[in-house]
Curated annotation (Swiss-Prot):
It comes from Drosophila melanogaster. Disruption phenotype: Total loss of dopaminergic neurites and drastic reduction in dopamine levels followed by degeneration of axonal bundles in the embryonic central nervous system and subsequent nonapoptotic cell death. Also exhibits cuticular defects. It holds the Pfam family ARMET_C. Its main location: secreted. The keyword Acetylation does not apply. GO terms for cellular component: endomembrane system; endoplasmic reticulum; extracellular region; extracellular space; synapse. It is found in: Secreted. Required during the maturation of the embryonic nervous system for maintenance of neuronal and cuticular connectivity. Essential for maintenance of dopaminergic neurons and dopamine levels. The gene is Manf. This is Mesencephalic astrocyte-derived neurotrophic factor homolog. Disulfide bonds join C28-C114, C31-C103, C61-C72, C148-C151. Residues 1-22 form the signal peptide. InterPro entries: ARMET-like, ARMET_C, ARMET_N, EF_Hand_1_Ca_BS, SAP_dom_sf. GO terms for biological process: dopamine metabolic process; dopaminergic neuron differentiation; neuron cellular homeostasis; neuron projection development; synaptic transmission, dopaminergic.
Amino acid sequence: MKTWYMVVVIGFLATLAQTSLALKEEDCEVCVKTVRRFADSLDDSTKKDYKQIETAFKKFCKAQKNKEHRFCYYLGGLEESATGILNELSKPLSWSMPAEKICEKLKKKDAQICDLRYEKQIDLNSVDLKKLKVRDLKKILNDWDESCDGCLEKGDFIKRIEELKPKYSRSEL
């Protein structure tokens, strides 16, 4: 009887430890969001065949930029990828495994997948542009796919951002 009680307690503790160690979205945000977005883009017939999933992922990766592009590179979804662990994504997706679990498996294969983080977005309505570094001002323009030809000083970048702000900033009323 005591042995049975100990087995139940150990089993409960093991389950508790497993759930507390489960990967959370914020621990591997680029992976989880990219896998979810990719899975949502697939139709039902494609989701059943892992080979079709791999083909669709390679096509999906061609349109990605920044962190998602790097994620694709790590998995082998790009032609220039050095390694390929695409089956670690495609097979679990064909089994309808959740994105968090897929990313947990991917992290075990390649830890740098979960090192990818989205950069914090700058709220242009509340930030004082004069207090930002030129690097951050350039990043704002780059994110907008805009350039600042002839900008040499910080004031030039601020002026260009102020000109473009109505076009790109979303202000809620």
